[in-house]
Amino acid sequence: MDKTIAIVTGASGGLGREFVKLLSKEKKLSEIWVVARNVQKLQQLAEEFGTKIRPIAKDLSDNVQRKELSAMIAEERAAIQYLINNAGYAKFCSYDDLSVEESINMINLNISAVVALGLYCIPYMKPGSHIINIASQASFQPLPYQNIY
């Protein structure tokens, strides 16, 4: 494991982008894998932050695409210094306006992807590596129209 990487999900905007900005200054990192659905925004990150950036377009609510990312991690066999699980979303609406598919997708991204990526990455993490899971205050402050979130 000569290569050291960071993986940032939900990297195309907001907090994810800010994590990429900070990590791009880390001299010990060989690559920063930026994972999100929007290919154009991922390419913009590569243009803005340089050659360390490896854009990976995946929808992590999809189990097949999560497994594809797992295969990439296994194939690379790099030391993972940081896993930043930042991807997530919520649809704010009345519960009866939320489809079963939308509910399952939200659960898959906000919960299943976080658990899966942690399990995929741990075998490649050394002592001193970090997993950062970005979550919501919604569990402490429930709000109307955020039933699944």
Identify the role of each PLM range.
Residues 49-64:
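Rossmann-fold cofactor-recognition segment
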Residues 136:
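Residue(s) in the substrate-gating loop at a strand-loop-helix junction
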Residues 12-13:
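Conserved glycine-rich cofactor-binding loop
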Residues 24-44:
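Conserved glycine-rich Rossmann-like NAD(P)H-binding loop of the short-chain dehydrogenase/reductase
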Residues 118-119:
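A short, exposed helix-loop element centered on a Lys and neighboring polar residues
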Residues 94-95, 102-107:
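Substrate-binding pocket helix/loop in short-chain dehydrogenase/reductase
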Residues 86-91:
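Conserved NAD(P)H cofactor-binding loop of Rossmann-fold oxidoreductase domains
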